[in-house]
C-alpha cells in the first residue's frame, strides 16, 4: 500500500490535526513553513547528517542478541542500539534536528518538556551545541524520580522549571511548555519530544526519528542477507522511538509491528498508561488521538514505573496504525518490564532503560511464539543508567515484602 500520511491538514486517517487556540496558530503555521523550506534545502539535511555522524555517533549498530536468542530458544532478536547515541537514547535525533531548525528560523530560545529527563537532556545538549538559551519544563514528580537527569540538564546550561500543576508529571509539563510558548512566540521555539501535539509536530518528530528504521532496514540486509525481518518491536509512550523504527517499514506488509505499552500495575487497575488498550479518541495537547479518559471526557492520570511512558495519550500516527490494523499494541506490566531489565543485563551485558525494557519483555514472549525460523528487530531506545537506583530500590522493597510474607 502507498502510505502518504499525514494529509495537508495534518491528519493521519481520522487522527491528528491541529486543535490549538488562535494565539498558537501563527507559531504552528510559521513552523510548518520553515520545516517545508528546510525539507527542500539539501544543505539542511547535509548539515544534520554530519552532526548525527560526528556528534551523535550514528549510525547506531544493529546487534544480533545471540545470548538472549539462545536463552529464549525462539526467533532471532536483533537490537537497534539507540542506547549508544550521545546522551544515551533516541531523543537526540529529534532534539538536534529541531534545534538546528530553530536556529535557521532565527529563534534565540529553546523550551521543551520532559518526563524521564532524556528529552530534556537531549534538548539541553543540542541547545548548548548551538549556543541557545534553554528552559526545560518537568513535572515535580519526575524531578524527584529523575534527580540525576535534572542535574545533567543544569550542567548543560539549561534552566529546569518544576511544574506543580495537576498530577505534576509529563502531561502537566507539556501544558506548562505550551503556555510559555504562547507568551514568547517571537523569539522561542518549542521542541516537543514525542510524536504528539498539533501538526506539524508529529510529522517533524517522525521524520527526524525515522533515521532509526532507515538504518535498521539496511543493516538487517547487510547482516543477514535477507530482505526484511518478520517483526518490529518498540516501547510506546508518546511513541517517537516506535514511529522512528516503524515508519520506514510501513509499506512492507509482511513485517508485523508491535508497540509495547506501559500496563503499570495491570490494565484492569487504575494504574497504567495503556492508551490503545484502554483509551478512546479525544483531543489532547492540540491533536486528536487515543487518550485515557473517564466517562465525561476528563483525562485520566497515566501510571508507569517508567517516567518516559506515563503519558495518557499516544501519537496520532500510532492511533492511525492501530485503527487500520497496520500495527498491534500490547500491554506490558511494571513487573514484566523489570524482568526484561534484569534479563537483558544478565545475558547480554546491556542495561536497558525501563522504557526499552517494556519492548524487551514483549520481544521475549513474541520470540517464543514465532519460533527459531523467524527474526525481529527490537528498538533498544535508551540505556538504563538513569533507572538503576530506582530499580535497586524497587527490587529491595519487593524482596523485603517477600521476606515478610514468608516470616
Curated annotation (Swiss-Prot):
The reaction(s) this protein catalyses: (1S,2R)-1-C-(indol-3-yl)glycerol 3-phosphate + L-serine = D-glyceraldehyde 3-phosphate + L-tryptophan + H2O
Gene3D superfamilies for the chain: 3.40.50.1100
Pfam families reported in the protein's UniProt record: PALP
Pathway participation: Amino-acid biosynthesis; L-tryptophan biosynthesis; L-tryptophan from chorismate: step 5/5
GO biological process, one term: L-tryptophan biosynthetic process
The keyword rRNA-binding appears for this protein: no
Keywords assigned: Amino-acid biosynthesis, Aromatic amino acid biosynthesis, Lyase, Pyridoxal phosphate, Tryptophan biosynthesis
Top class in the EC scheme: lyase
GO CC, one annotated term: cytoplasm
Names of the cofactor(s): pyridoxal 5'-phosphate
InterPro entries listed in its UniProt record: Trp_synth_b_CS, Trp_synth_beta, Trp_synth_beta/beta-like, TrpB-like_PALP, TrpB-like_PALP_sf
Tagged with keyword Acyltransferase: no
Enzyme Commission numbers on file: 4.2.1.20
MF (Gene Ontology): tryptophan synthase activity
Transmembrane segments: none
Modified residues (N6-(pyridoxal phosphate)lysine): 91
Entry similarity comment: Belongs to the TrpB family.
Subunit text: Tetramer of two alpha and two beta chains.
Database matches in HAMAP family: Trp_synth_beta
Biological role: The beta subunit is responsible for the synthesis of L-tryptophan from indole and L-serine.
Protein name: Tryptophan synthase beta chain
Species of origin: Streptococcus pneumoniae (strain ATCC BAA-255 / R6)
Amino acid at each position: 500500500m502507498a502510505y502518504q500520511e499525514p494529509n495537508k491538514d495534518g491528519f493521519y486517517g481520522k487522527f491528528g490535526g491541529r486543535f490549538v487556540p488562535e494565539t498558537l496558530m501563527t507559531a504552528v503555521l510559521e513552523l510548518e513553513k520553515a520545516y517545508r523550506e528546510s525539507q527542500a534545502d539539501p544543505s539542511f539535511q547535509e548539515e544534520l547528517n554530519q552532526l548525527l555522524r560526528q556528534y551523535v555517533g550514528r549510525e547506531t549498530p544493529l546487534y544480533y542478541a545471540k545470548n538472549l536468542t539462545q536463552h529464549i530458544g525462539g526467533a532471532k532478536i536483533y537490537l537497534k542500539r539507540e542506547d549508544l547515541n550521545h546522551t544515551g537514547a533516541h531523543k537526540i535525533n529529534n532534539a538536534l534536528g529541531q534545534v538546528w531548525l530553530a536556529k535557521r528560523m532565527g529563534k534565540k530560545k529553546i523550551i521543551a518538556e520532559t518526563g524521564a529527563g532524556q528529552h530534556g537532556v537531549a534538548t539541553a545538549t543540542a541547545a548548548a551545541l548551538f549556543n541557545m538559551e534553554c528552559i526545560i519544563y518537568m513535572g515535580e514528580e519526575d524531578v524527584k524520580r529523575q534527580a540525576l537527569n535534572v542535574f545533567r540538564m543544569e550542567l548543560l546550561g539549561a534552566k529546569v522549571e518544576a511544574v506543580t500543576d495537576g498530577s505534576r508529571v509529563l502531561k502537566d509539563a507539556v501544558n506548562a511548555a505550551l503556555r510559555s510558548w504562547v507568551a514568547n512566540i517571537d523569539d522561542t521555539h518549542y521542541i516537543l519530544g514525542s510524536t504528539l501535539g498539533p501538526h506539524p509536530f508529529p510529522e517533524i518528530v517522525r521524520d527526524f526519528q525515522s533515521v532509526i528504521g532507515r538504518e535498521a532496514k539496511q543493516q538487517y540486509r547487510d547482516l543477514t542477507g535477507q530482505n526484511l525481518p518478520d517483526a518490529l518491536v518498540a516501547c510506546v509512550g508518546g511513541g517517537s522511538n516506535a514511529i522512528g523504527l516503524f515508519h520506514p517499514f510501513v509499506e512492507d506488509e509482511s513485517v508485523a509491528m508491535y508497540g509495547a505499552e506501559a500496563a503499570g500495575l495491570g490494565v484492569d487497575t487504575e494504574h497504567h498508561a495503556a492508551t490503545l488498550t484502554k483509551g478512546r479518541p479525544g483531543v489532547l495537547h492540540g491533536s486528536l488521538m487515543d487518550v485515557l479518559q473517564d466517562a465525561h471526557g476528563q483525562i485520566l492520570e497515566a501510571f508507569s514505573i517508567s517516567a518516559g511512558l506515563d503519558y495518557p495519550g499516544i501519537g496520532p500516527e500510532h492511533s492511525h496504525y492501530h485503527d487500520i490494523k497496520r500495527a498491534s499494541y500490547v500491554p506490558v506490566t511494571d513487573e514484566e518490564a523489570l524482568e526484561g531489565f534484569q534479563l537483558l543485563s544478565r545475558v547480554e551485558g546491556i542495561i536497558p532503560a525501563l522504557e526499552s525494557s517494556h519492548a524487551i519483555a514483549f520481544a521475549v514472549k513474541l520470540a517464543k511464539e514465532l519460533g527459531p525460523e523467524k527474526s525481529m528487530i527490537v528498538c533498544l531506545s535508551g540505556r538504563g543508567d538513569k533507572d538503576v537506583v530506582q530499580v535497586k530500590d524497587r527490587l529491595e522493597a519487593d524482596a523485603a515484602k517477600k521476606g515478610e510474607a514468608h516470616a
